[in-house]
């Protein structure tokens, strides 16, 4: 997900996306602990997506 895709969304859409990504990050961390995660790089990608969404939210303020 790129910042250009995110910046045109409304605050409500961004909040929903942020919540979904945080839930996804939580489940990925659980899978990592139980050795079920096949690609650990997914965690860093989701964390970067969360940072991009937070940047877009702060830009709206």
Swiss-Prot record:
**GO biological process: any one?**
translation
The signal peptide stretch is: none
Cite the entry's keywords alphabetically.
Answer: Ribonucleoprotein, Ribosomal protein
User: Can you provide one Gene Ontology molecular function annotated for this UniProt record?
Assistant: structural constituent of ribosome
Does Iron show up as a keyword for this record?
Answer: no
A GO cellular component annotated for this chain's UniProt record is:
ribonucleoprotein complex
Could you tell me which Pfam families the record lists for this protein?
A: Ribosomal_L29
Would the keyword Membrane turn up in this protein's UniProt record?
A: no
InterPro entries to which the protein is assigned, alphabetical: Ribosomal_uL29 (IPR001854), Ribosomal_uL29_CS (IPR018254), Ribosomal_uL29_sf (IPR036049)
Checking NCBIfam families in the record gives:
L29
Q: Which protein family is it in?
A: Belongs to the universal ribosomal protein uL29 family.
Q: What is this protein called?
A: Large ribosomal subunit protein uL29
Q: Identify the species of origin.
A: Campylobacter lari (strain RM2100 / D67 / ATCC BAA-1060)
The major lineage groups are:
Bacteria, Pseudomonadati, Campylobacterota, Epsilonproteobacteria, Campylobacterales
């Amino acid at each position: 997900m790129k910042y250009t895709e995110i910046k045109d969304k409304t605050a409500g859409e961004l909040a929903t996306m942020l919540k979904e990504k945080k839930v996804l990050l939580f489940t990925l961390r659980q899978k990592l602990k139980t050795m079920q995660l096949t690609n650990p790089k997914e965690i860093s990608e989701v964390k970067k997506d969360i940072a991009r969404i937070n940047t877009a939210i702060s830009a709206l303020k």
